[in-house]
Amino acid sequence: MKISVKNTQYPSEKEQFAYLKDCGFDGCIFTFGHYFSRTGVFGDIYNVTDEQIEKHFTMLREEAEKVGFVVCQTHSQFSGHPKRYDSMDEIVKREEACIKATHYLGSKFCVVHPVFTANRRYDIEMKENFDAAVDFYKRLIPALEKYDVYCCIENMWHCDPVYGHICATILSRAKEMVEMCNVLGDRFKICVDVGHGLLTQDDPCEMVRIAGDKLGCLHAHDNDGILDLHAFPFTPHGKPCGMSWKPLRMDWTAFMKALDEVDYRGSLCFELGAPGPEPIWKAGYEYMAAIARYLTTLRNAEY
């Protein structure tokens, strides 16, 4: 089972793959905010050509291949909040560019957040938001088919406007994710984000089982059940002071066994960035890789 981590752009765009390989990783999740957001390298999206995208991301794939490194999945630039853009047309244009780049990077999976409606928290606006997300995702199908890429929908969270804590929203529940994939068709898979599941009190192990053969990729990270910390596995401990309820804690052994149950063949991807100040980055990445290697030994099957 390959282990991967979020790409870093360090020590440079071209050298990042060799750096992460030297830290112990086999591949990465390549994030596109640096490229296709409004302030990105290709931020002027209406004037970016297919040839520019092909040239740049083919170059990066070749740099990765030189050191035996792979892009296991990508993450599009869209946060899920349409008000940050002029129109849905602009959002779709940027997401199509991410799909093209995914193809040229040599990956099959691009994680794309759903559209959020303004009040989609708990069970509010469930149908309205589901339908809006379906309409958005359907517009990506031509690009997904043309470039042979699968869109992975991710379980999300929102904030309670009164109490300020994290709560469930669109696609927080695995059953809703499966339902959406069934509506959208074979070009859509599921990305189980472990940390997000903990925050919405959805057991990531059970989410994997419900996703079944629709599970396309993973975002593995830990937290205290309160904040989206994107912490190393095993790091958050104990119950925060003053809390009357016990946050959901991650059972990593059970999680790896759940991957066996559904015959998951993808990579174990840590959605984690560089830890701390630059002088300790390499040690931090090496520690992350050691954790990831340990977790892979908990599986019964070898992939």
Predicted regions and their residues:
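Histidine/acidic residue-rich metal-binding segments in metalloenzymes
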Residues: K138-P142
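Structural motif corresponding to the early beta-alpha repeats
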Residues: D26-D135, K146, W252, D260, ...
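Short, flexible/disordered intra-domain loops and linkers
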Residues: S37-E51, Y122, P161-I170, C241-S244, ...
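Histidine-acidic metal/acid-base catalytic patches
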Residues: M1-S4, Q9-D26, E65, V92, ...
